[in-house]
């Protein structure tokens, strides 16, 4: 094993399991600041902000002779989505900068995580969210009197309202794009440890919006490319009703081949301009170096997955048997991004 791989493995804090907190397990495997003192300060703040940011890999099923494993990013997370990692990272970054009041826009997942993690440490939070997404939220996450929730009827105006709020109140914009990538580095570290220990991943499938997750993951994996010999092929999935990254990389004509409508398949991915974060070129690089691809799914594809027969069981039952908690509130699937990834696969 190479010296770089050994250095990574020796940096793992084995007092913390990955199922408990990938933030604390891998914090010393990553470098966040050029200054050693600033880097140590941030890592010490992670000890304060971390609650529960657990990941695990579970066998799901064999479909057409392909073994499908699920990266469970929900069951062991404080807020039931991978955005719990963003909560731990962004609130640590906010504390590092001395922020006491923060404002952010979100489809729900990131905003819930920032609210929960921020309120716990005394920050005043302002979440701007599309009003159609209110049913996805748990009111108990916003019980703190300093946790403010602002609903906007037209989802296309959410960013504008949040920007005006920050300007009027003198509030910082969080999370910054680099913080999102840092959060994804922890997912990459989890996958890297598994791969260095022998897990073979031929293809990594994820639902994407701005593609912060795959970019952060592949930044970590790329550093150990010589040890891994090859990177997993990346397959990015977008919902047909809102597919700006697909359009940016493949063109509007290609996107037009799929039937679209106004109803989003995953309402938390409401942003129609995620390419403005400047992530298109790095996503293109990942697709080129891994011989990957982007695909679209629509409501018909999604319905086929939900109604499909997998060895006599539905997909939600298969996931439950694997120990994966798909959060459902009042009969509605709250977290659909993982199911969209399965649909695209």
Where are these predicted regions, by residue range?
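PLP-dependent amino-acid enzyme catalytic core
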Residues: 1-345
């Amino acid at each position: 094993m190479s010296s770089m791989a050994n250095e990574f493995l020796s940096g793992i804090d084995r007092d913390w399991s990955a199922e408990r907190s990938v933030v604390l397990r891998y914090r010393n495997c990553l470098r966040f600041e050029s200054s050693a003192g600033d880097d140590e300060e941030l890592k010490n703040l992670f000890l304060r902000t971390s609650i529960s940011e657990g990941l695990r890999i579970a066998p799901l099923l064999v479909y057409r002779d392909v073994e499908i494993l699920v990266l469970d990013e929900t069951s062991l997370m404080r807020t039931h989505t991978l955005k719990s990692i963003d909560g731990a990272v962004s609130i640590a970054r906010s504390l590092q900068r001395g922020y006491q009041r923060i404002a952010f826009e979100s489809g729900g997942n990131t905003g819930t995580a920032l609210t929960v993690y921020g309120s716990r440490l005394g920050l005043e939070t302002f979440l701007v969210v599309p009003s159609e997404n209110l049913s996805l939220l748990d009111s108990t996450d916003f019980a703190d009197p300093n946790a403010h929730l602002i609903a906007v009827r037209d989802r296309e105006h959410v960013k504008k309202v949040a920007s005006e709020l920050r300007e009027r109140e003198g509030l910082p914009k969080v999370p910054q794009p680099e913080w999102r990538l840092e959060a994804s580095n922890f997912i990459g570290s989890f996958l890297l440890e598994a791969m260095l220990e022998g897990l073979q991943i031929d293809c990594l499938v994820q639902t994407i919006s701005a593609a912060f997750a795959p970019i952060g993951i592949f930044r970590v994996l790329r550093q150990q490319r010589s040890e891994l010999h090859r990177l997993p092929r990346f397959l990015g999935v977008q919902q047909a009703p809102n597919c700006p990254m697909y359009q940016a990389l493949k063109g509007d004509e290609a996107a037009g081949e799929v039937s679209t409508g106004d109803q989003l398949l995953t309402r938390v991915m409401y942003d129609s301009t995620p390419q403005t974060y400047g992530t298109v070129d790095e996503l293109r690089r990942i697709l080129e170096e891994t011989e990957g691809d982007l695909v679209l799914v629509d409501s018909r594809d999604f319905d086929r997955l939900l109604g499909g027969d997998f060895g006599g069981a539905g997909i939600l039952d298969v996931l439950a048997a694997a120990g994966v908690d798909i959060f459902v509130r009042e009969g509605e699937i709250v977290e659909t991004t993982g199911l969209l990834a399965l649909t695209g696969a």
